[in-house]
Amino acid sequence: MAGVKAYELRTKSKEQLASQLVDLKKELAELKVQKLSRPSLPKIKTVRKSIACVLTVINEQQREAVRQLYKGKKYQPKDLRAKKTRALRRALTKFEASQVTEKQRKKQIAFPQRKYAIKA
């Protein structure tokens, strides 16, 4: 059961992944017992990598489910937000940048930008 592929795991259901994880952990425990009699056992490495792969796929699926849950909501958990630089996260949004004070708005209405046409 060693050497599983991530693309194959992504097609499986949650229950199938959980059962495969249990099987892999049992196999790893058996291999650890065998290691006492035979020190060099290369299969342990592949089983450990397979366990990591299964856990990674499970984690990806859980995060995607939570992403769908928070889609369209105003706030979402920090670990699901887009990873930007600190400065970009603190920058004004388009709406905040477009805000104008009442006084400035009145000035813009009273004295609009002049448009000039050049004679050719």
Swiss-Prot record:
GO terms for biological process: cytoplasmic translation; maturation of LSU-rRNA from tricistronic rRNA transcript (SSU-rRNA, 5.8S rRNA, LSU-rRNA). GO terms for molecular function: mRNA binding; structural constituent of ribosome. It comes from Saccharomyces cerevisiae (strain ATCC 204508 / S288c). CDD domains: Ribosomal_L29_HIP. The modification Phosphoserine is found at S13, S50. Component of the ribosome, a large ribonucleoprotein complex responsible for the synthesis of proteins in the cell. The small ribosomal subunit (SSU) binds messenger RNAs (mRNAs) and translates the encoded message by selecting cognate aminoacyl-transfer RNA (tRNA) molecules. The large subunit (LSU) contains the ribosomal catalytic site termed the peptidyl transferase center (PTC), which catalyzes the formation of peptide bonds, thereby polymerizing the amino acids delivered by tRNAs into a polypeptide chain. Keywords: Cytoplasm, Phosphoprotein, Ribonucleoprotein, Ribosomal protein. InterPro entries: Ribosomal_uL29, Ribosomal_uL29_CS, Ribosomal_uL29_euk, Ribosomal_uL29_sf. It holds the Pfam family Ribosomal_L29. Belongs to the universal ribosomal protein uL29 family. GO terms for cellular component: cytosol; cytosolic large ribosomal subunit; preribosome, large subunit precursor. The keyword Chloroplast does not apply. This is Large ribosomal subunit protein uL29A. Component of the large ribosomal subunit (LSU). Mature yeast ribosomes consist of a small (40S) and a large (60S) subunit. The 40S small subunit contains 1 molecule of ribosomal RNA (18S rRNA) and 33 different proteins (encoded by 57 genes). The large 60S subunit contains 3 rRNA molecules (25S, 5.8S and 5S rRNA) and 46 different proteins (encoded by 81 genes). uL29 is associated with the polypeptide exit tunnel. It is found in: Cytoplasm. The keyword Secreted does not apply. There are 2 genes for uL29 in yeast.
